[in-house]
């Protein structure tokens, strides 16, 4: 089975790629948008790169930024059976999708059809949603193709964005091997996505970095920890005050207090359920 693997240098793409490398399946080529490649050199990968990792394993790398006609010509020569894709942020041309005789499949970090879009982890953590990973057929409409594998995961408190993505990627990598096994045995089941349950979320904007004291301190803590990588302050209203929060330190869902307590650079903020402990920027307004 000739496989074209398309992705980026994020963990959500690299982890399944490494799983595929260690499997019995063969990767015919890797597709990356504007890859960084060094000819005839051995590179120490301090920061991992999908393109360089492929190159070090003698796997051809295809530049997906090429004109579509040139891209189709290159990939047609590989006689691709299957395209596997993870963490690739651009829409694939329909002509490229159609080159894969056994189908083109994408790994998405949510329980589709919920949380379609480019940053599903952000929105799931903001809304304290049930987390999971899905493999689905790639169609012209983003994240809307038939689901072939899906699994829920449970996350510990306080995980970073990278830790969450690694957890999702590890689960997704195992599901990928199950997809390949089912394809080989001609037993792959496809489930049409229920459009009535579908939701789509765009890239988050600065106004989306808010924490709501009507919820639980645990929810706010996990959201802030997971999204700190975006580098935004968090807006929080409590009583008559507006706070600009910097970092979530801890929470106590069993604690109860009437008002915000300031201790040094830390705020103890009462929520409907529990107390959030967070640092703040020093700017408070009444």
Can you say where each PLM-predicted feature lies in the sequence?
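One-carbon transfer enzymes
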Residues: 1-230, 235, 263-278, 282-285
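A conserved acidic, glycine/proline-rich C-terminal tail/linker
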Residues: 247-262
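A ubiquitous, low-specificity "background" feature that marks scattered single residues
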Residues: 171, 176, 241, 252-253
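Short, structured protein-protein interaction patches enriched in aromatics and acidic/basic residues
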Residues: 236-250
